[in-house]
Amino acid sequence: MFKKTVPLLSAVAIAISFSAGTGVANAQENASYEVNSPEPKSNDFWWPNKLNLEPLRQHSPESDPYGDDFDYAEAFSQLDLEQVKKDIEELMTSDQDWWPADYGHYGPFFIRMAWHGAGTYRVQDGRGGAAGAQQRFEPLNSWPDNVSLDKARRLLWPVKQKYGRDISWADLMVLTGNVALESMGFETFGFAGGREDAWEPDIVYWGPEKEWLKGDERYSGDRELENPLAAVQMGLIYVNPEGPNGKPDPLLAAKDIRDTFGRMAMNDEETVALIAGGHTFGKAHGAHKPEECLGAEPAAAGVEEQGLGWKNKCGKGNAEDTITSGLEGAWSVNPTAWTTQYLDNLFGFEWEQTKSPAGAIQWIPVDGQASNLVPDAHVEGKRHAPIMFTTDLSLKEDPEYRKIAKRFHEDPKEFELAFAKAWFKLTHRDMGPKQSYLGDMAPQEDLLWQDPIPAVDFELINENDVEQLKVAILDSGLSVPQLVRTAWASASSFRGTDMRGGANGARIALEPQMNWEANNPAELKKVLDTLKGVQEDFNDELSGDKYVSLADVIVLGGAAAIEKAGKDAGYDVTVPFEPGRTDASQEMTDVNSFSFLEPKADAFRNYYAEGNRVSPAQHMVDKADQLTLTVPEMTVLVGGLRSLDANYNDSDHGVFTDQPGTLNNDFFVNLLSMDNEWKKSSDNEAIYEGFDRKTGEQKYTATTVDLIFGSNSELRAVAEVYAMSDADEKFVNDFVQAWTKVMQLDRFDLK
């Protein structure tokens, strides 16, 4: 039973409020006060260098109010998506007094909501993106770049409330962006559901700065942006629209655009399409100076604001007095229709600097041209000049962007299709292969960025076939460590952040994965050649349409090796295996895009590349987080893989056993034994040497990620479980379960 303790001072305060009667209670309800009850200091306060294991505990099932039994895919399948779209479309022009729509249409507002939800995605580590609807939580709900989007989500609440659990906030926000575009005359490329909601904020490194929109701490050298970041400042989605650090230079801004959009996996054509397409709609808001008018962001606002922020005390507080970015104006004459007016204006006028009423640098046509071209969003009869940001002019001034923008201007159909495809990519980039898509509105064609995998068009092998194939693999001459290493290298490329990688597709046999240093290319080639031979021979013996893919053979090889290793250690082990993987081709694989999945470290193989800025232990936690592992799963996998002798390049660091290649718990037993003492190596400060405490004889070598399981108090507590005298069966079962989980992370067809 869960017991929530109450701090002593809080308990006293509660007792006083009850005994004082309703007068005190009413006073409390009407008062504005800060909660000053004492807060416990975290261990990080005292020991800031302590290894943080919290990423492995985030998004616990206990946080989900729907519980383990809820099947979102099943719930989503009950939706009448066309009716949902009709309800959303009706919302577009249902003006609300508390937040009036610009030009009588909420479409541009909802496009910004969807864009800023999806646009946090970064290709370097797959974090960010639309999945989870993280825009509802801190820090994203309070970023300066997301001012007013709290109102967009509140406008959408009646639709969410109506359809309940059948559509997640994450899916609804993206679908609403699509409907917004369609309601203004644009033909979208499609929509797929499948984004489940999160119930707490992601633990994400958004940058080193401690203030919003300040500093260049994330840059070094010749404006080199720190990895894995994909925005120029803390609190921005991409770039500063006024130019780098507010400097209104379109060419310098183009460099920032190319870098940040590239880190979101967009090429130049997609970047131009997104900027030009997105700025066809709506307007920027900077009617007054934010510092003089806006209240606290949602995370800092009072409880009476009910999750809303940036309360505006100037003028009406909304409509023509709205403040978001501080820039003010519209790009197009008709901001609620799909047109080429953005490009018409970009190339049709020369532009001069001006400032918005809020003091932000922006651009208008020179010499007062077109000063009455654009209607006001709220005041009838009032008109304005069109505007451009510094970053808009980058599309005109940068030579490569200009070529693309001119081409789009001359061919509106090409522009429309390019924007449709780029928008679909923007809003679906973090969902992985099409196998994870829900609904029937997604495009049928395979897109390279989706990491396509062929459909199963053959009969799967049965249990008898599996047993025969395991024998053939074990008789091939490959060792247990080789088979385990190869299966792990294939499956552990998976990233739970954007559902990319994994064993399905056998991309470990393709560029670039086959030449990743962590995969030991020389050994990998020999193993793959042997497994391909086994696969071909086996398929030749099969009858009918029965077939086994290389991807399945690789995973089954790991399973067979673990079963043998368990048997050699005295355990009867069965590793679950589900056939059904297929093999991708090199043509289906974007080499540049897949290069971002290359591990810079893999503690499970005791691999750590040179030039790393992050510690081995931190890399270990990050890798485990990407594999969606818990602390116990990470622990048992590291210990088991050490005993299986599965280290990178046959290293013996952490192999604390006299029987390498067998499945045993010796790693934990010997690591925690007081018979051994550890010292840093005099030859290599990254290596530790283990000595017999009595004889002084050196017995083992280890790395940080080996010894951390004995030095970190939390990891040691888990390691002790697997070192106990009664731990044999639990260790084996837990290892097999965790191993199988990793092997099946990308099997969306099984979920």
UniProtKB/Swiss-Prot annotation:
Q: Name one GO biological process term.
A: cellular response to hydrogen peroxide
Q: Name one GO molecular function term.
A: metal ion binding
InterPro entries given for it? Answer: Catalase_peroxidase, Haem_peroxidase, Haem_peroxidase_sf, Peroxidases_AS, Peroxidases_heam-ligand_BS
Superkingdom per UniProt:
Bacteria
- Listed binding positions for heme b are 279
Q: What does this protein do?
A: Bifunctional enzyme with both catalase and broad-spectrum peroxidase activity.
Record's subunit section: Homodimer or homotetramer.
- Listed name of the protein: Catalase-peroxidase 2
Q: What is the organism of origin for this protein?
A: Idiomarina loihiensis (strain ATCC BAA-735 / DSM 15497 / L2-TR)
Mind giving the lineage of the organism this protein is from? Bacteria, Pseudomonadati, Pseudomonadota, Gammaproteobacteria, Alteromonadales
